[in-house]
């Protein structure tokens, strides 16, 4: 059984692992790497191939983590900035989200034998996990609101203008429904969003820093491992859903 998880994309596949395993549940197959005796890495897009964000089996992944005993999960995402002041290579720790996905599976509780559950979303991301990461990370970092779109297309200028106007700070394609499903199963969840560029229409500046973005994501993952090794020393009174 494992207590901790890191969820991420292709940038994290180079993390040193003990072995690769898989687990199957009623929602499908989940592949994962064992990083140490307490921690696993779950590659959203698959281990040896690439599944687009719209087709990721989020329920299979989250249910697998729950079945494996996971209590804490840091997700690391690649995103674009909706604001000129949110510069590339910044990590934005999500404190809230806007979900503009359309055709994904958003709940485990589908009625009948699965029952129905209405989950509170007043604190979808663990503020204590954010705090611990901010204490240990030495790069550009801030908090903000994560917008998730369906993809696979990128957002239009007017879409990004709208997302910014309603409070969005960064935009990506993998944040939802992952955060919702983690909350449903009681997994304490944080989202670290690595800004790779500006969204369409945000600025005239052209920024292309794919390699640096991957380096930042990998650096963040190793910071998370250090947090896990320290045993997640939360303050008394920390609030979790």
Q: Residue ranges of each PLM-predicted region?
A:
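His/Asp/Glu-rich mid-to-C-terminal helical/loop segments that flank catalytic regions of hydrolases
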Residues: 200-241
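Short acidic/polar active-site loop segments enriched in Thr and Asp
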Residues: 71-72, 169, 188
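Metabolite-binding pocket within alpha/beta catalytic cores that recognizes anionic/polar moieties
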Residues: 1-119
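Zn-dependent metallopeptidase/amidohydrolase metal-coordination segment
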Residues: 173-209
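Non-catalytic positions within long, well-ordered alpha-helices that form the structural scaffold/packing
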Residues: 66-69, 164, 183
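Active-site rim beta-loop-alpha module in soluble metabolic enzymes
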Residues: 122-165
């Amino acid at each position: 059984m494992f207590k901790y998880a890191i969820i991420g994309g292709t940038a994290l596949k180079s993390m040193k692992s003990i072995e690769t395993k898989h687990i199957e549940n009623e929602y499908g197959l989940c592949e994962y790497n064992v990083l140490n005796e307490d921690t696993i890495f779950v590659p959203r897009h698959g281990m040896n191939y690439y599944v687009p964000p719209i087709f990721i089996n989020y329920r299979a992944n989250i249910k697998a983590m729950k079945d494996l005993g996971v209590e804490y999960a840091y997700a690391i995402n690649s995103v674009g900035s909706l604001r000129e002041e949110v510069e590339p290579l910044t990590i934005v720790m999500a404190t809230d989200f806007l979900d503009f996905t359309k055709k994904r599976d958003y709940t485990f509780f589908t009625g009948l034998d699965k029952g129905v559950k209405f989950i509170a979303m007043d604190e979808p991301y663990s503020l204590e996990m954010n705090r611990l990461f901010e204490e240990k990370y030495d790069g550009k970092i801030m908090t903000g609101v994560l917008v998730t779109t369906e993809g696979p297309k990128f957002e239009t200028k007017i879409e990004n203008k709208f997302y910014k106007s309603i409070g969005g700070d960064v935009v990506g394609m993998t944040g939802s429904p992952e955060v919702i499903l983690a909350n449903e199963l009681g997994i304490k969840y944080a989202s670290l969003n690595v800004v790779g560029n500006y969204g369409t229409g945000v600025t005239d500046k052209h920024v292309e820093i794919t390699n640096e973005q991957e380096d930042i994501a990998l650096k963040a993952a190793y910071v998370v491992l250090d947090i896990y090794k320290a045993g997640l020393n939360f303050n008394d009174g920390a609030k979790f859903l």
